[in-house]
């Protein structure tokens, strides 16, 4: 649209700018044509200006363009001079670069100032289209010249261009339509907002449109209204923050993804390093001389003042188990697809055997399952698992924070962020990281050597003897119902199935290894069973663990008589040898001490009623424990089905299973069916007899059993009486109802007989207790 524009040929009275000092870059506009005290270009009546936009990128916060543009200033001048259509009526006088706005002013001298400014402007643009200006500072943009209708203000304040321009009016207000028609020629407008009769806000879709409009129209007078324009200052950080908060559906998942990427890129390599260090150097640390010396000295202080025979300790037992060691070594050199399970009761030497076998292995990872699965608190489990694998750092406190963030996001945007890290998720993350490290260790030589003929799986198959070894000590098969234990078993199964590690499971449970086959695709486990030493070997073990001066014939005879009382459990034999060496005790005193200690432990653990303040109530009662103790003090074992006929155990076996888990008893199986019940340890048999032979304890426990049986009979009678009352309320009794009533009456009589018999026993036991001093 052809606008009737008025042009100002002289400088306005701008004395209010006369004392302004540049805030930064003090010699930015060192040009003879610029009046630096007011920031305006000096123009004669027959001179005019063109503004060429987009010569360089619009400056950012650091204003790098100012320095880079100086390198190309001469080249730009040549291109601009060549593109301008100089003629007899119009000559290019000078070029004033305006780096702050990304363009330049062209000062033009006319022979006679033109009346049709639109025609002149189009003529100049056509010339620039034919000879476009190209610059490496803005290679994908074509600069366009615009005729300047106002009086541009070349300030050097620390103000950067913005797409939003504020326009202040001096004179009558203008309508939104009129402002749109004036400024649309410089580019697309997003909005035109009238703020007040003296101001408006123009929002352009591009930055080049805003810079062109401001440099061409500042100081322009439309009718009687003069424009004063400035960029609206935009705090980009605040704007970005506002945008983030106003688009939570986008930003919250983006933040979650950023956290995930940061964790993966920053912390995962650190964690892998610590896990690898634990696997590679954990075994070596136990073999360091200083550590070994401290362990040896500590053990010797406890075991014996005699050090010269330390190397002979445990020699007899390992002579007989040499075949077991060779078998384990052979399995560890093979490419197995199943677990290696070492079974044996606690104290049978499973860990010592495995330590001897893996002593020369480079990469060994050890888990103490007793400590790992002893807690029901998942956070404690995660912490223990991280400690045993070497996983560090562990940010367990972030679980609660991420849960709160997820809840807040669901309430705010209606969907979850996906950043919640549960304890189960952390467990899997720890195990996955450990698995990755084990795989890299298993394939390390494959990467270092020229093994192009073998792929990774073939390499692992061929070099199975170099695979890392994972040891799960005290892994209880009967507790596979524990979800965390199942997760660890599944992870161990993956190690075996992928062939990246050998997995040894040391378990005190006898039998039950079939349950592990589900984790290795049904492959049968390699099982090694360790038992107690026979009497001859047990005697040799104790004898050869003593100094030579103590190995007398009298001692051998005494051991031959006394050792059968405690059996051949390796831990108990160590205790006897320690008592003989350190305390110079007799054999009978040493054996008596270990029996008394076990009897005291049984009394405190199984024969005392549960404390009222105890958080975890045992599922067995003292009378149930005493019943088993009494039976096993008289017999080597109890048939499981016979035990279930006892009134205290009849109808449920929870108590028996609980006593097995507490290691008071051991249950053997036949075809997955409970078969026989044995004492938990050989020494327990002697301890049971000692407890049963205590007249006061025996009488008190029999009283407890009698009272328990009376209570059970009373409850049964009460239930039968209630049913009889219901039958009586029916009125006329049919024959079937009469039979039921007769049955209930018979049961009541039978239970009453039980009560009578037990009350007589109570009287007898009470009288017996009175006679004991």
UniProtKB/Swiss-Prot annotation:
CDD domains (alphabetical): RRM_Yme2p_like
Start and end residues of each RRM domain: 163-234
Domain of life: Eukaryota
Topology term for the membrane: Single-pass membrane protein
Compartment(s) where it occurs, according to its Swiss-Prot or TrEMBL record: Mitochondrion inner membrane
UniProt keyword Repeat present: no
Coiled coil segments of this chain: none
One Gene Ontology molecular-function label: RNA binding
GO cellular component, one term: mitochondrial inner membrane
Keyword Membrane (UniProt): yes
Membrane-crossing residue ranges in chain numbering: 250-270
Any one GO BP annotation for this protein: mitochondrial genome maintenance
Residue intervals on the Mitochondrial matrix side: 30-249
Transit peptide (first-last residue): 1-29
Keyword annotations: Membrane, Mitochondrion, Mitochondrion inner membrane, Transit peptide, Transmembrane, Transmembrane helix
Main location class: mitochondrion
Segments on the Mitochondrial intermembrane face: 271-773
Pfam families for the chain: RNA12, RRM_1
Function: Plays a role in maintaining the mitochondrial genome and in controlling the mtDNA escape. Involved in the regulation of mtDNA nucleotide structure and number. May have a dispensable role in early maturation of pre-rRNA.
Entry similarity comment: Belongs to the YME2 family.
Protein name: Mitochondrial escape protein 2
Gene: yme2
């Amino acid at each position: 649209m052809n606008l009737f524009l008025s042009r100002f040929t002289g400088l306005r009275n701008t004395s209010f700018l006369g004392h302004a000092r540049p805030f930064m870059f003090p010699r930015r506009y060192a040009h003879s044509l610029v009046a630096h005290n007011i920031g305006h270009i000096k123009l004669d009546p027959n001179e005019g200006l063109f503004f060429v936009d987009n010569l360089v990128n619009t400056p950012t916060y650091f204003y790098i363009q100012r320095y880079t543009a100086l390198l190309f200033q001469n080249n730009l001048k040549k291109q601009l001079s060549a593109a301008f259509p100089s003629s007899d009526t119009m000559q290019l006088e000078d070029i004033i670069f305006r780096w702050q706005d990304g363009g330049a002013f062209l000062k033009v001298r006319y022979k006679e100032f033109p009346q049709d400014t639109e025609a002149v402007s189009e003529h100049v643009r056509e010339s620039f289209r034919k000879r476009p200006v190209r610059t490496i500072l803005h290679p994908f943009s074509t600069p366009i010249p615009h005729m300047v209708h106002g009086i541009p203000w070349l300030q050097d304040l620390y103000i950067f261009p913005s797409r939003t321009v504020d326009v202040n009016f001096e004179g009558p207000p203008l309508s939104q339509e009129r402002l749109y028609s004036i400024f649309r020629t410089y580019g697309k407008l997003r909005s035109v907002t009238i703020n007040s009769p003296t101001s408006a806000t123009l929002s352009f879709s591009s930055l080049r449109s805003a810079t062109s409009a401001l440099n061409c129209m500042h100081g322009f007078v439309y009718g009687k209204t003069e424009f004063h324009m400035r960029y609206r200052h935009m705090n980009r950080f605040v704007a970005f923050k506002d945008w983030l908060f106003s688009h939570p559906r986008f930003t919250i998942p983006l933040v979650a993804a950023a956290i995930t990427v940061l964790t993966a890129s920053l912390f995962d390599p650190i964690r892998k390093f610590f896990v690898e260090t634990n696997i590679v150097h954990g075994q070596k640390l136990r073999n360091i001389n200083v550590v070994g010396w401290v362990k040896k000295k500590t053990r010797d202080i406890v075991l014996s003042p005699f050090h010269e025979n330390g190397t002979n300790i445990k020699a007899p037992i390992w002579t007989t188990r040499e075949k077991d060691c060779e078998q384990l070594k052979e399995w560890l050199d093979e490419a197995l697809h199943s677990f290696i399970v070492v079974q044996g009761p606690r104290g049978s030497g499973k860990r010592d055997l495995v330590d001897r076998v893996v002593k020369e292995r480079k990469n060994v990872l050890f888990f103490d399952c007793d400590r790992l699965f002893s807690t029901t608190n998942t956070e404690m489990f995660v912490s223990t698992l991280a400690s045993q694998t070497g996983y560090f750092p562990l940010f367990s406190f972030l679980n609660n924070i991420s849960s709160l963030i997820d809840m807040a996001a669901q309430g705010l945007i209606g969907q979850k962020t996906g950043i919640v890290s549960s304890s189960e998720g952390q467990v899997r993350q720890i195990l996955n990281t450990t698995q990755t490290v084990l795989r890299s260790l298993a394939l390390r030589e494959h990467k270092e050597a020229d093994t192009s003929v073998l792929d990774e799986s073939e390499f692992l198959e061929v070099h199975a003897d170099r695979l890392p070894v994972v040891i799960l000590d005290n892994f209880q098969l009967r507790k596979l119902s524990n979800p965390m234990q199942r997760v660890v078993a599944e992870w161990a199964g993956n190690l075996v199935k992928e062939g990246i590690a050998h997995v040894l499971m040391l378990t005190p449970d006898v039998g039950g290894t079939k349950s592990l086959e589900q984790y290795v695709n049904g492959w049968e486990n390699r099982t090694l069973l360790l038992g107690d030493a026979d009497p001859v070997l047990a005697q040799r073990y104790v004898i050869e663990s003593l100094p030579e001066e103590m190995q007398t014939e009298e001692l051998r005879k005494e051991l031959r008589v006394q050792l059968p009382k405690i059996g051949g459990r390796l831990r108990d034999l160590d205790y006897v040898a320690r008592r003989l060496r350190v305390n110079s005790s007799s054999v009978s005193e040493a054996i008596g001490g270990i029996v008394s200690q076990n009897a005291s432990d049984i009394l405190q653990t199984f024969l005392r009623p549960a404390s009222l303040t105890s958080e975890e109530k045992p599922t067995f009662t003292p009378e149930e424990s005493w019943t088993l103790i009494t039976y096993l003090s008289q017999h080597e074992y109890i048939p499981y089905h016979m035990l279930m006929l006892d009134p205290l155990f009849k109808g449920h076996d929870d108590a028996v299973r609980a006593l097995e888990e507490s290691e008071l008893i051991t249950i053997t199986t036949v075809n997955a069916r409970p078969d026989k019940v044995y004492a938990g340890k050989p020494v327990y048999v002697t301890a049971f007899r000692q407890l049963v032979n205590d007249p006061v304890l025996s009488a008190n426990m029999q009283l407890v059993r009698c009272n328990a049986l009376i209570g059970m009979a009373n409850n049964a009678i009460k239930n039968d009486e209630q049913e009889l009352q219901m039958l009586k309320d029916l009125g006329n009794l049919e024959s079937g109802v009469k039979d039921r009533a007769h049955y209930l009456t018979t049961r009541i009589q039978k239970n009453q007989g039980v009560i009578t018999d037990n009350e007589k026993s109570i009287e007898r036991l009470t009288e017996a207790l009175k006679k004991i001093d």
